[in-house]
């Protein structure tokens, strides 16, 4: 597993404890109570390091190569999954994985953005950067879900929509805008979960829903920290400052009413205990579905409209009183 800078001290401590345990099998250098004392120190070290992460360190956790991706969530949560491909206009976009899923006996249309796990798969998936056909594919499956009365689950994990000339020529901006328009009026419950990177319009095109959730170390932003640093300071190395200024993580976005729920991750990030994350995400999806399924279509659409209508409202103080 690739090590992040803040993880090195923890890993060295873990190796030391493992070596003591191995040697103890032969020579009993340390008593079990002494080893337990070392393990408690390790727990305190982890708590200290991971409770005081900078926004940029959390971005690094979010981008960790071993972090669970959409296909991992499908394998970890679904009893059944039948993949559906193509946009019926141009081609299939491998950056989107979607299909009919069964989670704890309940059927969903599950649609996720997929980056890939190694060099060849990342190139095949275009590093999770959707082309117009990817957004059309997601919308096609969403409309199919509406037709058959299935709730929709979107898993968001993208560094952004593909900015290439070919994508622009095929109507990238229109494809994203059309998704926003169509998903806002779709007559079925929509649950959105940001599992990794949620960057710019690439994320937004699959993030219109009745409830928006994020994993603890995922981020949701109009731009990447590097892109922001390049624009503001003409220096992509100022990514740490940009990450702090963007307020891109769940606790800040929840205060702004952009996201509704922040799901905690295992200590160190989702890649340290994927099965626990799959369980928590599955429980969240089922819990929200039980809440949303009792709403009438009229109430569902009105609440969805009001949710996005009120994002961005703020109050200022004046001599005559607060103004919106």
From Swiss-Prot:
Pathway: Lipid metabolism; malonyl-CoA biosynthesis; malonyl-CoA from acetyl-CoA: step 1/1
GO molecular function: acetyl-CoA carboxylase activity; ATP binding; carboxyl- or carbamoyltransferase activity
Protein name: Acetyl-coenzyme A carboxylase carboxyl transferase subunit alpha
InterPro entries referenced in this protein's UniProt entry, alphabetically: Acetyl_CoA_COase_a_su, ClpP/crotonase-like_dom_sf, COA_CT_C
Compartment(s): Cytoplasm
Sequence similarity: Belongs to the AccA family.
Main location: cytoplasm
Provenance organism: Chlamydia felis (strain Fe/C-56)
Primary role: Component of the acetyl coenzyme A carboxylase (ACC) complex. First, biotin carboxylase catalyzes the carboxylation of biotin on its carrier protein (BCCP) and then the CO(2) group is transferred by the carboxyltransferase to acetyl-CoA to form malonyl-CoA.
Reaction(s) this enzyme catalyzes, per UniProt: N(6)-carboxybiotinyl-L-lysyl-[protein] + acetyl-CoA = N(6)-biotinyl-L-lysyl-[protein] + malonyl-CoA
Record-level GO BP terms: fatty acid biosynthetic process; malonyl-CoA biosynthetic process
HAMAP family: AcetylCoA_CT_alpha
A GO cellular component entry from the record: acetyl-CoA carboxylase complex
Record keywords: ATP-binding, Cytoplasm, Fatty acid biosynthesis, Fatty acid metabolism, Lipid biosynthesis, Lipid metabolism, Nucleotide-binding, Transferase
EC number(s) from the headed UniProt entry: 2.1.3.15
Source species, domain of life: Bacteria
Domain (CoA carboxyltransferase C-terminal) ranges: 37-291
EC class of the enzyme, as a word: transferase
Gene name of this polypeptide: accA
